[in-house]
């Protein structure tokens, strides 16, 4: 029987990896002051999240093997998981600067912490480099070492393309709803979120166990990308319709001029009069204008449209999971576990 990891177990691996990263920097005689800065950046930016992406690597590996992982297997899988968390940290530190964000995980964003400022850009680069330091240290002799390397490089580029499309489609200071479209939205969510959050952890587990045949990778991608897309649509829905006490934050997509699923759905069904209301009120840092949009979303019955989308999408995903060929080591349960975590979530 497979075994699910806990956050506590997963986090217990981090100190060893942090030590390896600091030792690597020490070997270059990085001065003490800079070493402690690097340590602080690693801890503040990598720890403190839910670690869903990282924990998906050992979880998927255990399902694929059909048993709990040995200590050595767990360490390997969790190390790959922490590399996905480092990738996430690199993206978040950078994104927060680009978006002029204020808080992250309930604290001021890294670049807004005392004495950090634009040094955060270099810190983000160092978080990305840490992935490859760990990969070399622990997987240099793994038969799929080059595949691991290429996977991280490819997924990083895919995420950056998604971010570029997002930044140019919805600049915060210039509202132009003609720029929005469901096609652009789909591109953004697939590349900015789905690849690194859903495909990457499972592909890493498959490479680790050496069952990443082209057929298995294709089957995984064909299910995990729609799953990631559904997850992001859900996120956009919760930003407006979720309860702040559930989602742990107050939604800001409307004021931030976000190219979200809700605004794109609205644009596809509005009357000319409602379109004018959208144009005049969307993407403004103004509570009253935000309230006008929220009312419009209610008038358009976007909650019902979302629920219809959810049932259709989940139905399609379930069909794909049922059709998986398990003869080459892939397991339906990997995907059922992902779907189970996100279907009808409220946060």
Swiss-Prot record:
Binds 2 Mg(2+) ions per subunit. The keyword rRNA-binding does not apply. Keywords: Cytoplasm, Isoprene biosynthesis, Lipid biosynthesis, Lipid metabolism, Magnesium, Metal-binding, Transferase. It is found in: Cytoplasm. Belongs to the FPP/GGPP synthase family. GO terms for molecular function: (2E,6E)-farnesyl diphosphate synthase activity; dimethylallyltranstransferase activity; metal ion binding. Its EC number is 2.5.1.10, 2.5.1.1. Mg(2+) 2 binds at residues 95, 99. Isopentenyl diphosphate binds at residues 50, 53, 88, 105. The keyword Transferase applies. Its cofactor is Mg(2+). It comes from the Eukaryota. GO terms for biological process: alcohol biosynthetic process; farnesyl diphosphate biosynthetic process; geranyl diphosphate biosynthetic process; mycotoxin biosynthetic process. This is Farnesyl pyrophosphate synthase. It catalyses: isopentenyl diphosphate + dimethylallyl diphosphate = (2E)-geranyl diphosphate + diphosphate; isopentenyl diphosphate + (2E)-geranyl diphosphate = (2E,6E)-farnesyl diphosphate + diphosphate. Catalyzes the sequential condensation of isopentenyl pyrophosphate with the allylic pyrophosphates, dimethylallyl pyrophosphate, and then with the resultant geranylpyrophosphate to the ultimate product farnesyl pyrophosphate.
